[in-house]
Amino acid sequence: MGFDEKREPTGGRLRLQDIPALTQDHCRMRDPAEVERIINEFVIGGPERMQIVSDFDYTITKQRTEDGGAVPSSFGIFNACQSLPENFKAETDKLYHKYRPIEIDPHMPIAEKVQYMIEWWTKSGELTSGFPFDQSEIDQIASKYTHALRDRTHEFFADLQRLGIPTLVFSAGLGNSVVSVLRQANVLHPNVKVVSNFLQFRDGLLDGFQQPMIHTFNKNETVLNETSEYYDLVHTRDHIIVMGDSIGDADMASGVPASSHIMKIGFLFDHVEANMKKYMDTFDIVLVDDQTMDVPRTLLSLIEKQHKLNLEAPKQSSL
């Protein structure tokens, strides 16, 4: 049965003004009425129609820590491994300092950025070839940064597991690092799937990354094989929360049916004023320097509250 626009949550239509997490100064919206509409659709649809699609670097992890310490990217964790060749870090640093400014440049069109991202990932793959590597080193480095997940991330992932909501972690970074951090932080639950760039080996030596290459501007659900187990799990779930920290992340749900209801949440930290308009035009909710999972958790709590009311209603009517 399709969504009935006239239906409302059992307790009445939810209003943004009654949801404290969404009325704070750092929580910006281009179209509050649209956000309110989507929230009500999510709440009516319940957890069985939900899925989450999230970036990893600086989305699940913080963009800054309270003590000012740096949070490495998933590739940064790999680059910190001691057994890498001496020139490896220097060469990857050169690539980072060349291409990262392009990735976050608020003035360059995305179509132009794509070619640079392909260059970056291709050159990174070429550097990551021809030497032995023990993957347990990634675990050793990753263990130091499990504290760098956004505040209340553990609770957020526990909520998702409890509600049976499939969660796709989509990363243009290094999947081996992503999996290691999530596993050691005890949030890699059975409902969580990681799609990313994973190391591959040939004859005991590193041989770049497995295909397909996933960069900032091509990661979306169209890369999920229609015969895959995860595709079977989510292709009927048409209520989607998308979370990311870069403009390209907003397209991670591309490939889902046009009838889907999608809430896009953007975490903005770099070049706030210069990026604000683009983020506001791209995301439904823009969170400025918010290092928590409070807003997505709030959405889940609203969905769960209505779900419980729905479960209780038949019991009450039978009394």
Swiss-Prot record:
Binding site for CMP: E103
Required co-factors: Mg(2+)
Family indicated by similarity: Belongs to the pyrimidine 5'-nucleotidase family.
Regulation acting on activity, per entry: Inhibited by high levels of AMP.
Record-listed E.C. numbers: 3.1.3.91, 3.1.3.5
Its job: Specifically hydrolyzes 7-methylguanosine monophosphate (m(7)GMP) to 7-methylguanosine and inorganic phosphate. Also able to mediate hydrolysis of diphosphate (m(7)GDP) to 7-methylguanosine and 2 inorganic phosphate with lower activity. The specific activity for m(7)GMP may protect cells against undesired salvage of m(7)GMP and its incorporation into nucleic acids. Also has weak activity for CMP. UMP and purine nucleotides are poor substrates.
Cysteine-cysteine disulfides: none
Residues that hold Mg(2+) according to the record: D55, D57, D245
Designated name of the protein: 7-methylguanosine phosphate-specific 5'-nucleotidase
Keyword ATP-binding: no
Gene3D superfamilies linked to this entry: HAD superfamily/HAD-like, Pyrimidine 5'-nucleotidase (UMPH-1), N-terminal domain
Outcome of mutating W121Y: Considerable increase (12-fold) in KM for m(7)GMP and decreases KM 3-fold for CMP. Decreases KM 6-fold for m(7)GMP and increases KM 2-fold for CMP. Decreases KM 1.5-fold for m(7)GMP and increases KM 1.5-fold for CMP
Native source species: Drosophila melanogaster (Fruit fly)
GO cellular component: cytoplasm; cytosol
Residues involved in substrate binding: S171, A172
One GO term (biological process): guanosine-containing compound catabolic process
